[in-house]
């Protein structure tokens, strides 16, 4: 039974790794700030999954320690990039949040140094042989691991907090995209915490089940980031789209960022406007010499 579980787990985690890479590429191809940040985040998520496969297959103590470090290092960088993404995604302008990005990068470097040292001198984790159904060793926490744990879950709390706070500040129709991302990160953190504090107690706690959730999280986060708003706007504009089918149509969201445009609008303004997903109403009006009040009133221009 243990062998069957191990085989199934390995197959599942390999599929999850492929999904992470595919979604990372798709996000990066969006060719904007959010896309690049998500692409890097998902790329590190794939590295986490790959290193965990190596952990499962490794039989030697030193090899297990090396691959465990290779697992913990990208985990921290993934959360650092996720926090940077969350600041951009929630359009947070608070200075403290942006300083937090720099602090997170410094902590990521310190975390990397700790786990580069750990295989030769155990300062963060040591390992106990168990000959389990899936892995051969489980970890025991040493003092320096506290830094890793506290700062990682600090980043988790920051990401969830930014998303929930943003959800309280936007119209009701837009709240699910922020709540969805925040809840997804929170669930993964809880599952990972089970693994951290109860390794080996039960079969599912012997392995980090949260790794399997990363691929689901990448899909959910990608969809909420790039597709949710357009889906909501399309539903709300289904009737007016038919009424104005012969007109160039451009729609901006409540923050003044472009959400929808049709091909006729692109043709009308292709010489004066460079359309991108980050185009704002103010930038559009400056490029076209259209009065911004016309857009705010909802009247055709």
PLM region spans:
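Sensory modules in modular signal-transduction proteins
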Residues: 228-260, 265
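Alpha-helical transmembrane segments of multi-pass integral membrane proteins
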Residues: 25-51, 69, 100-106, 141-197
């Amino acid at each position: 039974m243990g062998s069957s579980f191990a085989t199934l787990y390995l197959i599942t985690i390999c599929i999850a790794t492929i999904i992470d890479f595919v979604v990372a590429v798709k996000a990066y191809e969006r060719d904007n700030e959010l896309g690049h940040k998500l692409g890097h985040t998902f790329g590190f998520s794939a590295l986490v999954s790959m290193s965990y496969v190596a952990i499962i297959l490794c039989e030697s103590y030193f090899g297990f320690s090396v691959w465990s470090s290779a697992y913990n290092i990208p985990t921290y960088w993934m959360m650092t990039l996720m926090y940077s993404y969350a600041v951009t995604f929630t359009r947070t302008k608070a200075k403290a949040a942006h300083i937090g990005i720099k602090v997170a990068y410094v902590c990521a470097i310190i975390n990397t140094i700790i786990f580069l040292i750990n295989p030769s001198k155990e300062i963060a984790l040591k390992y106990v042989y168990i000959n389990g159904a899936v892995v051969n060793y489980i970890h025991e926490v040493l003092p320096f691991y506290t830094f890793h744990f506290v700062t990682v879950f600090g980043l988790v709390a920051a990401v969830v907090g930014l998303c929930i706070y943003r959800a309280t500040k936007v119209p009701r129709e837009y709240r699910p995209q922020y709540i969805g991302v925040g809840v997804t990160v929170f669930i993964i953190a809880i599952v990972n915490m089970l693994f951290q504090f109860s390794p080996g107690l039960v079969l599912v706690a012997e392995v980090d089940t949260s790794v399997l959730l990363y691929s689901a999280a990448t899909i959910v986060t990608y969809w909420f980031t790039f597709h949710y708003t357009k889906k909501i706007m399309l539903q709300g504009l289904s009737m007016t789209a038919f009424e104005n089918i012969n007109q160039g149509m451009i729609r901006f969201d409540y923050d003044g960022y472009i959400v929808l445009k049709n091909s006729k609008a692109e043709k009308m303004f292709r010489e004066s406007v460079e359309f991108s997903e980050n185009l704002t109403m103010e930038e559009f009006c400056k490029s076209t010499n259209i009065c911004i009040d016309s857009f705010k009133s909802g009247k055709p221009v």
